[in-house]
A protein has these predicted regions:
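Short, surface-exposed alpha-helical segments at coil->helix boundaries
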Residues: 4-5, 62, 238
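A structural signal for short, hydrophobic beta-strand segments that form beta-sheets
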Residues: 20-21, 78-79, 252
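An alpha-helical support segment within catalytic cores of ATP-dependent transferases
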Residues: 2-14, 120-195, 246
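Short beta-strand or tight-loop elements
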Residues: 20, 75, 181, 195, ...
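ATP-binding pocket architecture of kinase catalytic cores
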Residues: 25-147
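Conserved N-terminal boundary motif of the eukaryotic protein kinase catalytic domain
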Residues: 17-25
Length: 262
C-alpha cells in the first residue's frame, strides 16, 4: 500500500498541503501503476504509486516530462514530487482535465512536435536509462545514430525476443537487417532531436483545447522514430501529419525508414 503519510509530507514540501480529511481517489490512467487523484491546497494532484522498485521508472518519467517541458513548445503535466517511502514509490504530477482530441488540436500538435524536435543535442541517447512501458530502454550516449539504433534499439529488442524463446528465423532476419542498417542512411544523417519516445495515440489528449503529451520514454534520436510510433497504433489524423510536414518537411527515404522504425 502507498505510504500516504510520506506522500502527503512530500506534497506539503512542494507547496501542496493536503487538507485534513482529504483522501486519495482511485482514477484511470494507471495501466502499469495505481493512479489516484488527491485534492490539495493548490489544486488536485495526479499520483502514480507502486512498489519501491518502481522508483527508477517514476523518476525517469518525471525527468522526461521536465525535459519535454523545458523548450516551452508543447504542454506536458508539471512535476510536483517523486520519491520513495518504505516499500512504496510515487510520482505526483499536475492534474489536468483531459478531454477528447480535435482536428484543430491535432494540427497544433503536429506543429508543436516539429518545434520540440528542433531541440537537439550533440549526441544520441540520454543521461540515464528509462523504460518504454515496462520494457527497459538503454540510452548510452553515442555520436553514431546507426550504431546507437543497432545496439540499443533493434539489437536489444532481438535479445529480449531470444530470452523469451523467439529464436531461429526471427533472429536470422534480425541479424541480416542489422547488417543492412547503413543502407537506410546513405543519404540521410539525422540530428539528435529531443523525442517523446513513446508517442502513440494513448499518450496524448487535450486540456482546454490544447494538446498535451505524457507518459514519455525520452531520449535524443532521429525525429522520424517519434512519427513512426504515431503510425503504429493510429490515433493521429491527417491534420497532424500535414502540420508537421509543413513545419519541418521530412527527408527523402522517410517512408522506408518508417518501416524500419516500426
Amino acid at each position: 500500500m502507498p505510504d500516504w503519510t510520506a506522500i502527503n509530507a512530500a506534497l506539503a514540501d512542494a507547496g501542496h498541503d493536503v487538507p485534513a480529511g482529504a483522501s486519495p481517489r482511485p482514477v484511470g490512467g494507471g495501466d502499469i501503476s495505481a493512479a489516484w487523484c488527491l485534492e490539495t491546497s493548490s489544486g488536485a494532484v495526479f499520483l502514480k504509486t507502486g512498489p519501491a522498485s518502481s522508483y527508477d521508472m517514476f523518476s525517469a518519467e518525471a525527468e522526461g516530462l521536465e525535459a519535454l517541458g523545458a523548450p516551452r513548445v508543447i504542454r506536458v503535466p508539471g512535476v510536483i514530487a517523486c520519491g520513495t517511502s518504505g516499500d512504496s514509490a510515487f510520482v505526483a504530477l499536475e492534474w489536468l482535465n483531459l478531454g477528447r482530441t480535435t482536428r484543430d488540436a491535432e494540427a497544433r500538435l503536429g506543429e508543436q512536435l516539429a518545434a520540440l524536435h528542433r531541440s537537439t543535442a550533440e549526441a544520441f541517447g540520454w543521461h540515464r536509462d528509462n523504460t518504454i512501458g515496462l520494457t527497459p530502454q538503454h540510452n548510452d550516449r553515442s555520436d553514431d545514430w546507426v550504431g546507437f539504433f543497432r545496439e540499443h534499439r533493434l539489437g536489444f529488442q532481438l535479445r529480449l525476443a531470444a530470452d523469451n524463446g523467439f529464436t531461429g528465423a526471427l533472429q536470422e532476419q534480425g541479424a541480416r537487417l542489422m547488417k543492412r542498417l547503413p543502407v537506410f542512411f546513405e543519404s540521410y544523417s539525422p540530428e539528435a532531436s529531443l523525442l517523446h519516445g513513446d508517442l502513440w495515440g494513448g499518450n496524448w489528449a487535450c486540456c482546454d483545447g490544447d494538446p498535451v503529451i505524457f507518459d514519455p520514454a525520452v531520449y535524443y534520436g532521429d525525429r522520424e522514430t517519434d512519427l513512426a510510433m504515431t503510425r503504429l497504433f493510429g490515433g493521429f489524423g491527417r491534420a497532424f501529419y500535414d502540420a508537421y510536414e509543413s513545419a519541418w518537411p521530412l527527408a527523402t527515404g522517410h517512408r522506408e525508414r518508417n518501416d524500419l522504425y516500426q
